[in-house]
Amino acid sequence: MKLLSSWVVAALAAQAAGAAISHKLDGFTIREHADPAKRALLQKYVTWDEHSIFVNGERLMIFSGEVHPYRLPVASLYIDIFEKVKALGFNCVSFYVDWALLEGNPGHYSAEGIFDLQPFFDAAKEAGIYLLARPGPYINAEVSGGGFPGWLQRVDGILRTSDEAYLKATDNYASNIAATIAKAQITNGGPIILYQPENEYSGACCGYNGFPDGSYMQYIEDHARDAGIVVPFISNDAWAAGHNAPGTGAGAVDIYGHDSYPLGFDCANPSTWPSGNLPTYFHTSHEQQSPSTPYSLVEFQGGAFDPWGGVGFAKCAALLNHEFERVFYKNDFSFGVAFLNLYMIFGGTNWGNLGHPGGYTSYDYGSAISESRNITREKYSELKLLGNFAKVSPGYLVANPGDLSTSTYTNTADLTVTPLLGSNSSASSFFVIRHSDYSSQASVEYKLTVPTSAGNLTIPQLGGSLTLSGRDSKIHVTDYDVAGTNILYSTAEVFTWKKFNNEKVLVLYGGPGEHHEFAVSGASSSSVVEGSSSGISSKKVGKALVVAWDVSTARRIVQVGSLKVFLLDRNSAYNYWVPQVPTKGTAPGYSNQETTASSIIVKAGYLVRSAYLDGNDLHIQADFNATTPIEVVGAPSGAKNLVINGKKTQTKVDKNGIWSASVAYTAPKVQLPSLKSLKWKSVDTLPEAKNTYDDSAWTSADHAYTNNSAHSLQTPTSLFASDYGYHTGALLFRGHFTANGKEKTFFVQTKGGTAYGHSIWINETYVGSWAGTSINDNNNATYTLPTLQSGKNYVITVVIDNMGLDEDWTIGSEDMKNPRGIIQYSLSGQEASAISWKLTGNLGGENYRDTVRGPLNEGGLYAERQGFHQPQPPTQKWDSSSPFTGLTKPGIRFYSTSFDLDLPSGYDIPLYFNFGNSTSTPAAYRVQLYVNGYQYGKYVNNIGPQTSFPVPEGILNYHGTNWLALSLWAQEDNGAKLDSFELINTTPVLTSLGEVKSVNQPKYQARKGAY
């Protein structure tokens, strides 16, 4: 589209976004900005009314999942995630951008290599997935600093406010990232349809009285508009508070949205659903706060975070499981949600120190797609049922949500029904039923009374009862349109429907042991054309044919006129997929009326990625983890042959026109090295604890002040690491003094974030350690010193494990400025000023050396500063020793080895590095895992919980040499060693995924100035 001149753009962007005008499209009111020039500037591709968003003029339910590209730094794997999201029936992905990774050095923006967003955009477009861009500048996201680079600790102003110093600090990043996103907008042929400024701008504390500040939000929005952002702004209030909703003045967004995590994060008790946690007021609050925009849940719970010392993400997945999805997501549908984004759909990994101290390396999140990218959790399959239902139910978007009732629609107060009643545009109505006690595990029988075009009906009409099992919810439909055939009602849930040539197919499913009915208006008879007729009966009631059926594990197909109704149990429905078949080319395209209509129905196993027609050949791209029967329902009329993953497959066609075939799966032989048998070389990575060590090249901690406006000094000079440009990984401090012989004890308070630890030496004598806990982010300790000789020079060496910077979720808290380093200290018999300090972190600090792996990947250990964690380190003069032998005293040692892999091609083989502990009381030690130079694991043996570290192909070279390195930090008198350390695989998946390309893995080169 044609953009206006830059000065006009700037002028328009500075206007408040509160006012709106409307016009009519097919009977619906579409909201746009009041200023004609601004409307021209903004675009016509993405519009909205009170019911939904329109994309290219078509009403669209946006069903989305959260994916963070920076948590999967292998660009050729993006398509894998997008195709798995697409297969759910979803049409969108939301993504954050982590400022800390792109501007680690203030004023120097770098988004190249693994940080380049263009491959992410390209993969989304290839898969047919729209994007919501969420670049902050603040993102929270359980990343270090909430996405703020560490140097913001030195900004003299309150973060996330209109303080000039803070706003100026955001300018470079904000302009660059918005310009990048602008190029990928739908207006430029890209996938981005929405843009979120800021993140959860929802509350303040600690004496800050400037919230909410519309001028601050307006500044963030203007930056985006100035850089070319023209798609609508959407917000994500942390709760339904109405902040920055349209009409609120400066800083108002186009579409108001909010977040919700109703079941919380108590993964330790995955079967506990606390009373009162199911929201019931969202529709009411939406009508009060933003009635002119579609109801949007921009973050709704898709999993949970887990802290250090937690119970692990398997239990988070159990807490937020398939039952949670049925009850809570269908409850969201009862409010008429039109934009639903699940946080997370794929979590990924906090590699390279990018996480905050409240979490560990894994960011699996218990999400539908696991950290290792598998989709074996039942919640993925359950989500597929709902996603595909939404995709083929356009009437839902214009149905009117009503009030919940325990008496109007059922014959028992044990159940609650919320109606979404048909409108002038669509007669379809939807009735969301759940237990009144949403956590109930009881099975309740009921009858349903609902309004239909045939009058009020009490169902079942042919006898029997309906059943709602414990922790279940259903969406019953009435007057549901299937390509012109009116389904008067169905108590079984709709998975999908399609029209194929002159035939229509409707797929219904129910839970085990349930009884259901559906009725077809105008029909008079039915026949069972596949499967047993046992448990199926039909009768004409009024002007509709009613079919009653009992759920069975065996599929039945009932023919009613030109409609074939597939009757499935839920577990069987899990194996069905609905890939779009493009009319041109091989890419599925974005979801719209045309591409949805072109879809086929495929019964398969693990995953169906896509389908396309090439001449007479119907191609299906699919993944398999077992020998799998394949069925194709609705093969295109021109298709004669079935080609699966490039191989022509023998098929049979039954009397119902269903193609059947089989794909054989043979588990490949996967040969992995024994890590214990490898030749390991090692080097002391704490030479600082030797009397001969020279720290003259270190940074002098000589600031008699701090630039941290939120924390005052308690030491003669600042020992806050970020004051000197060190923000990530291990921090080392060396305090020099001349003894007077009176020194008996050393008191120190250190701060490194939750689960951190420290160790202290004086000269070469070990003084003690803080091994850390799962809840403490700082520690006060007094250590007894050996006898010191008067007049002799001594050095106190303090090593601190920086676990990341705190987030800044509440405005005014300034939590992100919580320092890392030494907060206070005292040496008995000496003034504090008698000690002169030096410090270091990663080599170069903000002028970080490894620009390929980014500003956070390496910390301040000697081996890291030298670059020994990279491939091909200079190990010729190192000791031959193994981490399985380890250290016999406190210290830190660095180990390196290499191994070759040549894994079977054509399989997606998840690999994990697993640590084991054979002692009942875990020893206190810490390990960093480096794979080809990338820090892909931070293991704290005495805190946990993570012991298994998945590393994706692309970081690991599946067909070549790999360099593996470990730092082993022993914090006990008897040292530490690894009891067990293995490389393992889980089930290989026969895959249609293309080649996975290894990321750039720069090898070791001697670093100028390294110390």
UniProtKB/Swiss-Prot annotation:
Gene: lacA
Protein's organism: Penicillium sp
EC code: 3.2.1.23
Covalent S-S links between cysteines: 205-206, 267-316
Function text: Cleaves beta-linked terminal galactosyl residues from gangliosides, glycoproteins, and glycosaminoglycans. Has high in vitro transglycosylation activity with p-nitrophenyl-beta-D-galactopyranoside, methyl-beta-D-galactopyranoside or lactose as a donor and galactose as an acceptor.
Annotated substrate binding sites: 96, 140-142, 199, 365
GO cellular component, one term: extracellular space
Signal peptide (UniProt feature, chain positions): 1-19
The name this protein goes by in its record: Beta-galactosidase A
Keyword set includes Hydrolase: yes
